[in-house]
């Protein structure tokens, strides 16, 4: 039984590494909305290679295009795909009405950055904001 239905949480990680959690969410009909920011690459590694290694990209484009809406259907949950803010707003409003878990895939540019970031070996004084 889910006790605190109003709690919100944000987790940032590679979504492919957490697919197994969908099985639990579906099994227990947890009203969890997962927003997937899909840039079709290994974004954090690519960002580091852009910022610190003069765009010498290696192993950041897996050459696979996962269809997260079809994957959601395969897990037995509702999936949405958005390419702009109005689509996201519509999908999110509908997802809030669902009784079980939902995924909202947001297609973003492969060069979209996650900021702020701190370089390896750095501390808060080395923070990169743009």
Describe the residue ranges of each PLM region:
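A glycine-rich helix N-cap at a beta->alpha junction
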Residues: 27-44
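Short, hinge-like loop/turn segments at secondary-structure boundaries
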Residues: 26, 50-54, 98-99, 121-123
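Conserved thiamine diphosphate
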Residues: 50-91
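Short glycine/serine/threonine-rich phosphate/pyrophosphate-binding segments
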Residues: 14-21
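Active-site-proximal loop->helix
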Residues: 22-23, 44-52
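Glycine/aspartate-rich loop-and-adjacent alpha/beta segment that forms the canonical ThDP
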Residues: 85, 90-130
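Single conserved hydrophobic/aromatic residue that forms the stacking wall/gate
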Residues: 1-11
């Amino acid at each position: 039984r889910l006790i605190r239905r109003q709690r919100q949480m944000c987790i940032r990680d590679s979504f492919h590494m957490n697919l197994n959690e969908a099985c639990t969410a579906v099994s227990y009909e947890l009203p969890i909305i997962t927003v997937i920011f899909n840039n079709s690459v290994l974004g954090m590694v690519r960002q580091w290679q852009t910022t610190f290694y003069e765009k010498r990209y290696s192993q950041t484009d897996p050459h696979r295009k996962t269809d997260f809406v079809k994957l959601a259907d395969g897990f037995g949950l509702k999936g949405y795909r958005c390419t702009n803010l109005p689509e996201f707003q519509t999908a999110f409003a509908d997802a809030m009405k669902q009784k079980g878990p939902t995924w909202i895939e947001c297609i973003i540019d492969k060069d979209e950055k996650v900021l702020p970031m701190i370089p390896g070996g750095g501390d808060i004084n080395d923070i990169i904001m743009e």
